[in-house]
Structure formats: C-alpha cells, structure tokens
Amino acid sequence: MALRLDGKALAKAVESRLQAQIESNLPQAGRPPGLAVLRVGDDPASAVYVANKEKACARIGVASYGAHLPSSTPFAEVLSTIQQLNADPRVDGILLQLPLPEGLDEGPLLMAIDPEKDADGLHTLNLGRLLKGEQGPRSCTPAGVMAMLRSQGIDPAGQRAVVIGRSILVGQPMALMLQAANATVTVVHSRTKDLVAHTREADIVVVAAGRPGMVGAEHIKPGAAVVDVGIHRKPEGGLCGDVRAAEVEPIAAALSPVPGGVGPMTVTMLLVNTVVAWCRRHGVDHDLADLLS
C-alpha cells in the first residue's frame, strides 16, 4: 500500500511556520503581509478558489485585498487595476485568478504584474530566475509538489523523473525544479509516442495532463512515487485526478490523494511567495528558503 502524500497535513504545518514568521517580523515591518486576488467574471470554480485563498490568509494573518470585476470589463480596465495593485504599498503579492472571461488575453496581464509581487510565480522574469537558479517567487503547484516529496524523505537526486504535461503553469516549471534537485527528467505530453515506455522507467512520476484517469497501473513501475496534480468533477459526483488511484496505490511507494494532495499545497505556496516578498520588502530575515529551493 502506497504512502499517502498528504498535502492537507503538510499545508497545515507550513501555515504554522508562516504564522510564526509573520508574528516574529510584524514589529519591524509595521504591517502584515498583503495578498491581492483579482477575479474577473463569475466562474463558479474561481469563486470557490478565491474564497479558499481568503480563508487561508485569515488563518495566518495575511491581509487580503480582493478585487472582483464583471466579465464585461475591458482589457484596459483590468490592466489599470493590476497597475494600481502594483503601486499599492499594502500589497506584497498579486494573483490574477484564471481562467479569464473569453476575449481577455491572460498573457499580457500576467506580464503586467510587478515581478516582485508575482504571487503565482508565472511572470517571465520569475520563470527565468527559476531556470537560472536565482531567488524569486516560484510557481505554486510545482513548488508544492517539491515540498510534498521532501516532507516524506523522497529525494529526487539521482532519480529518474517523468513529468506528464508541458504547460507553463505546471509541467515546465516542474521539470526545472526536479532538474535543480538533480533528478534526470523527461517531459512527456500528448504527442509522445509509447508513453508507458517512459513512465515505467521512472522513480518519480508527476501527472499534470488534465485528463481524468489517464494514468493507471500499466504506467507505473513498482515502488515509484506518484504525484497527481489533476482534479476533475465526476459526472456522478465527487472528485478524481489524472491517476486511477485504486489501480496505482497497491504498486506505488507513495501517492498523493485527490482531493487533499497537491491542491492545499498550491494555496499554501501562494502564501509562502507573499510572505517571502513581504520579508524582502522590509529587509527582515525569514527561514522559508527550503520551501522555494
């Protein structure tokens, strides 16, 4: 039976560290960290995600500055809102909640966010910093995956790792982080021939394909660590991931559940990026570097 990579429990432990960091540095900083979440439109899933982030902020003492614009908002107004948040001295982290309504190009809007306030780690400058091994905000989901592996003593160094999916949101930064941890990394995707031949050789498999139940027992070698980034609503109710967990659990050494795996750590890493940015702005020390390496 696979070890459970419990993202919910780890997120709670990291939140405790963040809360202690805030309490320690608040007298010198003079104000709490601030996270602004910009939501455009009325996507129901986005509303739930934003509410979860606001609750997480409240738990650890981060001030939350939400902004909600109607779906009819023109590009120029969304851009202006981002620029206002860039200039707001209370705000240390900015998140543009995706997806955006049809007709709004997310690329230029993400690039308009001040790289030092880029709570999601998606700005081109911060992806470049990741590539070069420099300090900066890290992409939240991949950073959360790395923290989950480390928390269970799973060291990628010298291991074969396969990342399924090549999105800029997860797949590509995930591959860079695993490489930085000295894994030998292969990225596979929808055009890859003989997917099983690649995944069956892997010691670590990160599945971020966005396809429900894509990965089963035939893809995984015995003893591998499997991280399921996918989350989908099943027609009959409930949630599932990209991995057929019932098949994989008996043969994997470790498996992240859905829900309760990567999702909670994605939110927590958003807070880590925000708190670290706050510390840097005020010239105070922090002990969170292990979460961003």
Curated annotation (Swiss-Prot):
Pfam families, per the entry: THF_DHG_CYH, THF_DHG_CYH_C
Residues at which NADP(+) binds: G165, R166, S167, S190, I231
Entry keyword NADP: yes
GO molecular function, one term: methenyltetrahydrofolate cyclohydrolase activity
Record's keyword terms, sorted: Amino-acid biosynthesis, Histidine biosynthesis, Hydrolase, Methionine biosynthesis, Multifunctional enzyme, NADP, One-carbon metabolism, Oxidoreductase, Purine biosynthesis
RNA-binding among keywords: no
Family matches, as InterPro entries: Aminoacid_DH-like_N_sf, NAD(P)-bd_dom_sf, THF_DH/CycHdrlase, THF_DH/CycHdrlase_cat_dom, THF_DH/CycHdrlase_CS, THF_DH/CycHdrlase_NAD-bd_dom
Biological process according to GO: L-histidine biosynthetic process; methionine biosynthetic process; purine nucleotide biosynthetic process; tetrahydrofolate interconversion
Enzyme Commission (EC) number: 1.5.1.5, 3.5.4.9
Recorded catalytic activity of this chain's protein: (6R)-5,10-methylene-5,6,7,8-tetrahydrofolate + NADP(+) = (6R)-5,10-methenyltetrahydrofolate + NADPH; (6R)-5,10-methenyltetrahydrofolate + H2O = (6R)-10-formyltetrahydrofolate + H(+)
Superkingdom to which the source organism belongs: Bacteria
The protein's annotated pathway: One-carbon metabolism; tetrahydrofolate interconversion
GO cellular component: cytosol
Complex and partners: Homodimer.
Role of this protein: Catalyzes the oxidation of 5,10-methylenetetrahydrofolate to 5,10-methenyltetrahydrofolate and then the hydrolysis of 5,10-methenyltetrahydrofolate to 10-formyltetrahydrofolate.
Stated family: Belongs to the tetrahydrofolate dehydrogenase/cyclohydrolase family.
Protein name: Bifunctional protein FolD
